[in-house]
Structures are given as C-alpha cells and as structure tokens.
C-alpha cells in the first residue's frame, strides 16, 4: 500500500503557487476579410489607432489607414503572399519607427530601416518615429548660412541656404538627379550629413548612384534610403518620411543635414494608388484630397534651428518630374507653393548642349539671397539680368537682318556667360573658382576670347589660380569676400590666361 505524505504534497502545492505567473497579455486581434493589390480589409481590431502597425499571421507588417464602421483598411509593407482570408491580424500598439544614429552613415536601407547592402547589422541603439512634428516657430531661425552646391549657375543666381527647401523640377532625363548628386559631392569636408531618398526608382539606378558616391568618398557622410520600383506602394509612400527622420536625428544634435527626395512625383503616385485601393474619394487628377498635406508635412520638417535648439539645420531638395514641361499640373504647383524656390531644368536647353540645363528666367530662390556669400553676391548681381536680356535679344535677333554694335556686344557677352556656366557632371567647383569664373564673364574680361574657347578658358583659369595664385583661393575660401587685393590678383590671372590663349590661337 502506498503511503501518502502530506508534507510532500503541500511542498509541491507551495512550489506551484510560487511559480504561478500572474501576467496577462491582452492582444487586439482581427481576421482578414479580403486581401489583394497590397491592401487588406480586416474585421475586428476594435482598439486599433490610425497609423498603427499591424502584424499578419505570416509575419508581414502593415499600417492601419482606414478605420471604418465594420472593418479596418490596412496597407501591406511586404509581399503578403502568405495572407489568406480568415488569417489573424494583431495590432502591435506601435507607430512605424526607424533606427537612427551614426551607424547608418555609408549604408543603404529600406524605409523601415532594414539594411539592403549586405553589410550586416546597422549597430544603432536609438530609433525615431517615421512621422514626427515639424519644429515650431520659436524653435526656428531665418536661413542665413550658405549651402554650396558646387554648381556655378545655382550658387551665383539661385543661391540655397541651410534650412531651405529648394525644388528641382524638370522633365525626365534633364539632369535633376545629377544636380542633387553634385550637391552631395560638394559637401565633402563641410561636416554635412546627407540623406538620399530614392523613391520608385530602378534598382540599377540606385546602385549606380551608390557607386558614384563610394568612388568619390561621399558615401562616408551619406545615408541612402531606397524604396525601389518593385517595392510595395506603402514603402514608396513612407520612404521620404524615413529620410526626414534620419536627418532630424542629426539636425537635433546640432549638425547641418541635406535631404534629397528623388522624386516626390512617384511618392504622390504611390499614395494615390493606396488611396484609390482603399476606396478614398479621388480629387484632381485622381489624387486624394490630402496629397497637399502629404507633401507639406514632409517639407515643413526642413528647418534652420535656433541657437537654443543647437543651431542644426535640415536642407531639403525635393525633385519633381514634369510631363512636357508642364509646371501647372497638380503636384508641381503644390510643391512649388510649399518650397522656398525652384530650379527649373529645360529639356530644350539640355538638348542644345547646355549642362546643367537650368532655365534661369523661371528659376528662383526666395530666401537664399540672405545666405549667399558676399564674394559671389557682389559680382553675380547683374548675371541673372544679363542672361535674361540675352535670351530676349537672341530670340529677337533671329528676325533682324543687321544689328547695331551695342546689341552685337550684348549678344556676344551673353553667349560667353552661357558657356562659362557649363559644367560637367560630378565636378563641383569651390567658391573661389566660381568667383573667378563669374567675375571674368560679368566684367567683360573675356569679350575677346572666341565663344568656342570659353569652356577651355574656364578650365585653364582654374588651373592657373591653383598653381600660380594659391593665395587668391585661400583668401576667398577663408574670408568669403572679394577684397581689392584679391580682385587685383584675379585681374592679373585673367589677363595672363587670356593673353596666352589668344597668342596660341594666333
């Protein structure tokens, strides 16, 4: 007969009582009613928030966007091939966030902060919400520091300041991305963190940009956020906000940052696709009613912070692609009204051989003038006017048989200025070189140089200054002012180069 030992039974009961785990997990769950085209309709999820992350049975993540009477409309941030009707969906209680920190520099990530470059873990410990409020009025300061692009035409006539939003707009294949990449390359040794956001682009194009930045040593201070053409619409829609969050981290640490959104037309299309599939009412050009807010809340995050906030800045260069030069379409007009100016690229100028193909007449920088360095501001004042007058005269002179000497001189000056502003891709110029080139053109010091040799003159003048007058370059780079002493040095250099060129030509 088995003897029952009460002490043993009581010991076991005590042990079980002590080990009893009282924690209760409450999860908000629902089930899939319908799925397809990157959208899922979910029944249940009673307590879900707008914009909350939800997790499907197969591990795919989504965002709850439409909260309706009897269902929730969620967009999928993955393929979602394993999601079926009746699959369970769990609300996570979290809003989409992205890892931030120095570990992101030199890396390629997707809009959720997942590395795409095969270099392993990002090594970051902090994260930021993808959607963050823009800095308030008191936290801001007016734009007053220059953001040099290295492109003479922009730095002289359409200057950009730190904390500004400057739109780059033009048809496809007019060099919009090239201007953005040149600007990143020009930030070398300037202690500026750059974020390049590729939205809906070919994976090959993103790889090419990454390679260009790596070859020229610019990837060390750049983060690339890529939502390729093959990615779901939800990721293409989120990509710019991710880029802004990464830049904000550095901005609030007191650093200057530069963000390029390439391009917001594709983000608007992705948002339109999501909205129409969620059965939201369409507006003009079938875009949803809040597409303006979609872009304004993104671009308002760019700012120059006050001294109390650490003096950081975020400069935004959004890119918009137009169709046949139509800047009066819905998305272009929206973004033009949000930004502080635009650089308009013309396909006609591009095809005529003018690179960068900037149409100076309708390009403008509304706040950059306050940030422009004194050296180039002093000499570039008349440049924009002279080029605008030249364009007008050139159109008129096609119909005139004989022109007076003054008109011929003005046409000749305009042609030479046009040639001076030509610049090959991936070769940004430092401030001193820009000052030298613009000075020579505006002051009429190269009126005797044949038009077809102006590009050569520009190259030789830069080489001459580097080898024979390094003190001029040093003076301009440090003082940022064209002093009488520096002006004398520059005049001597221009005279020397032009006389040598004319002598060899003869």
UniProtKB/Swiss-Prot annotation:
SUPFAM superfamilies, from UniProt? C-terminal domain of alpha and beta subunits of F1 ATP synthase (SSF47917), N-terminal domain of alpha and beta subunits of F1 ATP synthase (SSF50615), P-loop containing nucleoside triphosphate hydrolases (SSF52540)
Record's GO cellular component terms = plasma membrane-derived thylakoid membrane; proton-transporting ATP synthase complex
According to its UniProt record, where is this protein located? Cellular thylakoid membrane
Q: Which positions in this protein are listed as binding ATP?
A: 170-177
One Pfam match, given by its short name, reads: ATP-synt_ab_N
Per its record, what are the GO molecular function terms? ADP binding; ATP binding; proton-transporting ATP synthase activity, rotational mechanism
Catalytic reaction equation(s): ATP + H2O + 4 H(+)(in) = ADP + phosphate + 5 H(+)(out)
PANTHER family reported in the protein's UniProt record: ATP SYNTHASE SUBUNIT ALPHA, MITOCHONDRIAL
General function of this protein: Produces ATP from ADP in the presence of a proton gradient across the membrane. The alpha chain is a regulatory subunit.
Q: How does it assemble?
A: F-type ATPases have 2 components, CF(1) - the catalytic core - and CF(0) - the membrane proton channel. CF(1) has five subunits: alpha(3), beta(3), gamma(1), delta(1), epsilon(1). CF(0) has four main subunits: a(1), b(1), b'(1) and c(9-12).
Name this protein carries in UniProt: ATP synthase subunit alpha
From which organism does this entry originate? Synechococcus sp. (strain WH7803)
What taxonomic lineage is listed for the species of origin? Bacteria, Bacillati, Cyanobacteriota, Cyanophyceae, Synechococcales
Q: Which gene encodes it?
A: atpA
């Amino acid at each position: 007969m088995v003897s029952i030992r009460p002490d043993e039974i009581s010991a076991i009961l005590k042990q079980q009582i002590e080990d009893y785990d009282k924690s209760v997990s409450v999860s908000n769950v629902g089930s899939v009613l319908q799925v397809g085209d990157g959208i899922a309709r979910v029944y249940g999820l009673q307590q879900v928030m707008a914009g909350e992350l939800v997790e499907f049975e197969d591990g795919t993540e989504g965002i709850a966007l439409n909260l309706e009477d009897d269902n929730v409309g969620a967009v999928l941030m993955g393929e979602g091939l394993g999601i079926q009707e009746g699959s369970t969906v769990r609300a996570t209680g979290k809003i989409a966030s992205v890892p931030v920190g120095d570990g992101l520099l030199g890396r390629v990530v997707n809009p959720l902060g997942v590395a795409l470059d095969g270099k392993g873990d990002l090594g970051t410990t902090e994260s930021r919400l993808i959607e963050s409020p823009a800095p308030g009025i008191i936290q801001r300061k007016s734009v007053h520091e220059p953001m040099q692009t290295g492109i003479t035409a922009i730095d002289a006539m359409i200057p950009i300041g730190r904390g500004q939003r400057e739109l780059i707009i033009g048809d496809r294949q007019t060099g919009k991305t090239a201007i953005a990449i040149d600007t990143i390359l020009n930030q070398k040794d300037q202690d500026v963190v750059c974020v390049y956001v590729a939205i809906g682009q070919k994976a090959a194009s993103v790889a090419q940009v990454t390679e260009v930045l790596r070859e020229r040593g610019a990837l060390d201070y750049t983060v690339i956020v890529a939502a390729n053409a093959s990615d779901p619409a939800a990721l293409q829609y989120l990509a710019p906000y991710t880029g802004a969050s990464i830049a904000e981290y550095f901005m609030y640490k007191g650093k200057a940052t530069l963000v390029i959104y390439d391009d917001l037309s594709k983000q608007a299309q992705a948002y339109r696709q999501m909205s129409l599939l969620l059965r939201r009412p369409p507006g003009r050009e079938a875009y949803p009613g809040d597409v303006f807010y979609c872009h304004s809340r993104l671009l308002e995050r760019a700012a120059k912070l006050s001294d109390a906030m650490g003096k950081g800045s975020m400069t935004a260069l959004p890119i918009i692609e137009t169709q046949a030069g139509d800047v009066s379409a819905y998305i272009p007009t929206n973004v033009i009204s949000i930004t502080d100016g635009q650089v308009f690229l013309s396909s006609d100028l591009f095809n005529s051989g003018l690179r960068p193909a900037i149409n100076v007449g309708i390009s403008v920088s509304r706040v950059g003038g306050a940030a422009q360095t004194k050296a180039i501001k002093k000499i570039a004042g008349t440049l924009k006017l002279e080029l605008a007058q030249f364009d007008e005269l050139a159109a008129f002179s096609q119909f005139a048989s004989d022109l007076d000497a003054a008109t011929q001189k003005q046409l000749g000056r305009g042609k030479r200025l046009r040639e001076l502003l030509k610049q090959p891709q991936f070769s940004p110029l430092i401030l001193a070189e820009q000052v030298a080139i613009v000075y020579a053109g505006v002051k009429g010091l190269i009126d005797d140089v044949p038009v077809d040799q102006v590009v050569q003159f520009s190259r030789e003048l830069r080489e001459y200054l580097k080898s024979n007058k390094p003190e001029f370059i040093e003076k301009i780079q440090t003082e940022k002012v064209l002093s009488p002493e520096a002006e004398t040095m520059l005049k001597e250099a221009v005279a020397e180069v032009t006389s040598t060129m004319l002598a060899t030509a003869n």
